[in-house]
Amino acid sequence: MGIQKESLISKGQVSKCIRKLDYENYEEFKNACIQYLDLISKRKKFLNPHQSFETNVLHFTKDFIQNIQYMINHINLKSIQKLVQDIKQANKVYLYAHGDVRSVCYNIQRELQIYDIQTIICDADFNKDYHFLDNDILIVLSTNGHSFHYNKRVIKRIKESHVDQWLITCNESITLCQKQIIVPLLDEKYSEYIIKYMIDILLLELQN
């Protein structure tokens, strides 16, 4: 571990810090850092520095609305209703996500708590042993599947989990869970925004 030389602290202190961040070891922490840097490098830019802020906002809004309309016209709304039905009937709802879409888990958890639905957000690397019971469901959110590229162990653990599973993703080539909702995209650049909007629709359906 070369990091202790650069940071001028002991190997034991580095390991302790890493464990406090919920990582099992340095290798896992390093892979997470590589993944994060990769996500940053792929981050989309929407604002044109040569245009005014007002023009940028208008262009973004116009394109965003077009992408929303495309998604609504092509998504399987019955699948969303089925997932909502499963959520309402679930004993516990487990949520797992990586990257930007992980923040959505907290929105879902907050909304489900309103309906007294127990919700657990799984750790970022799916390391903990979750004791899934009958009527529990696991919802996996992945905008484009890039996160899974770095961690095959997570894929293996999810597939081996004995629990009813749902995957919500914009990438139709991922076959991870028994049940899937594919979020159609007009422009891949808007994937993070469109998948979050789709979750908002799902949460609206919970009110029925």
For every predicted segment, state its role.
Residues K78-N91:
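Glycine-rich phosphate/diphosphate-binding loops that line cofactor/substrate pockets in enzymes
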